[in-house]
């Protein structure tokens, strides 16, 4: 998993994990554009699977997103996955200036509209009429045209039961939240995805469960202590979002997210991190030596995750190589 960087740096960023043995690279989206980063990476590291994980859906029309994904699928010879998410109201309305009403149903319609565009690029006929998007006009001049690769897979970020069912019904994969510990995955993700798949006459195995695994790894207490503090800060950030509170509550940490939000409102960022105990970290992250990490992740997510994203696989060349060895052991 990588945060988008200046485009001039992406070539090296993509080549390093490929050389280390990773099968793919996933770009998040924040201040920079995940799609542009993926485009540069596709030329710098041919053969590497690339994903947006996740791109913000609503600021772009379904047609624009479909065209971009289509070109990336062509550029990667069929190794691109389109990951989409709603973001939250404040960002979509106040930063992007777009509508956010009923984000779940809107994203469902968005995914179907994107897939209708994929079909139109092959057939020349665009026909999607949904609750939020109506697309019925395309000409050869405004179509990217057919490609040899299959249609891109479309994955969605989902946390609550409705969104998980929607993912099972219309998407090709679901991006689980980084705090998605195994209990949450078993209680909510797998059964709701299966229910959505059944509604659409699909098999649950058709939907990839994509899990970002936070890791604390090192061969000494000192090395792991440093990583633990980094994970603690990330967990404090995630704990400040009300929509994720039920995951913490069900894991036995009721009230933790409320305390984190109190510290956030007061501007006490150190206090936010101080609310994260070692017990929280043991639940939501995986701690191990380098030699034991692959086995620890495989054991933790066996029968749950289809794909594991190494959330903390960043750093210098040696660190990339060691995480690459972990990735190879898990294949």
Explain the meaning of each model-derived region.
Residues 1-331:
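Active-site-adjacent structural elements that line small-molecule/cofactor binding pockets in enzymes
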